[in-house]
């Protein structure tokens, strides 16, 4: 059934409240069910930072865009209504369209006739004026076409001239550059000969001005480069072994005098800095600055910025590349600068061990309680509901576990229950952290596994078993 409805009544229902136009991608707010264009409501939320419905002002929370839902019903209504309107226009369309086409053609013809008449009057001013109603279109069109052909012909004749002039200018530029004479470079052989002559002659030897200014500019620079090579005249070769230095040995007795061997070379040479050599005395000791590294003899060494070596004749040590500085003795004993700052290690280690033990004792303990199937088979106890138990205080004794089982199983006293670990009874006064240590120590090596992050912890829970206390265990506990 088709019904006719006024468009004025329908359009407000299909219009967006923000832009007052028909819906484009109709979207509905899920909280209040008001419909808008998708672009309009998104701009409202994003650009204007509005967190409420523009119509009813309902708060949409922190993320209002998540409350938007595309509404297909409004889109279908819009398509149905506007299709009917378009079909009604198409039915009445051919007549109106033909009339509009004819009117447009008439307008175009009138405009072209006016343009032709105006151009004709301006081109021939001496000709008498013609009445406005008379219009001759074909000859004017031919004249315009001829005029265009002549203009194109003139343009085609002018183009090669312009290009020829441009090419001529481009070709003339490199000729000016080529006309300049290039400076001749001096040959390289005389420079090499001159360098050999400089090496053989003294430094104050002057050059004649007739040889050219280029040699006077180049030679001093190369001579300066050669200076450090010739100035490094050192009596000792770098690859040679350094002089042997014997350090005075300290005797075990403090009262006896030190036995010092004769020193072959009593000077320490610093090759790079060329410092003044220092004589080694009996009251001085060679030490290196690498305090963390100790020599094989146990004494520490101190570097002085260069690389030298030391070797002892008695022990036959290999030379070590070090430089040495002198440090005075105080009362014939070497003073350790770091001795005053060190603290006794024993008290610190004991405190750390106590802290570690306290932290271990404060850790919670996980275990499981299961009924024993090997002990006291005649009177088996039922299982409890809890599969795993966690105790925060690891200093708790086993007697609390017996009380827990007494409550869960409904027994008269805790003495009726016996707790087992690996087929061995557990004493009631034993603490839980000691029980965990016992469980770890008694675990055989093949059964021990390394824990992985994210894996199941069921295999790392201590299993405890409970049963009725038998007479044998009572007699055993009484004898103890």
UniProtKB/Swiss-Prot annotation:
Enzyme class: transferase
Biased composition (Basic and acidic residues): 175-193
Pfam family, any one: zf-C3HC4
Compositional bias per record (Low complexity), positions renumbered to this chain: 113-133
Region annotation Disordered: where it falls in the sequence: 93-133, 167-193, 241-261, 280-356
Reaction(s) catalysed (UniProt annotation): S-ubiquitinyl-[E2 ubiquitin-conjugating enzyme]-L-cysteine + [acceptor protein]-L-lysine = [E2 ubiquitin-conjugating enzyme]-L-cysteine + N(6)-ubiquitinyl-[acceptor protein]-L-lysine
Compositional bias segments (type: Acidic residues): 246-260
Biological process according to GO: protein ubiquitination
GO molecular function, one term: zinc ion binding
Keyword Metal-binding set for record: yes
Basic residues bias spans: 103-112
Protein's pathway: Protein modification; protein ubiquitination
Renumbered zinc finger spans (RING-type): 16-57
Biased composition (Polar residues): 298-309
Keyword Zinc: yes
EC nos: 2.3.2.27
UniProt keyword list: Metal-binding, Transferase, Ubl conjugation pathway, Zinc, Zinc-finger
Name of the protein this chain belongs to: Probable E3 ubiquitin protein ligase DRIPH
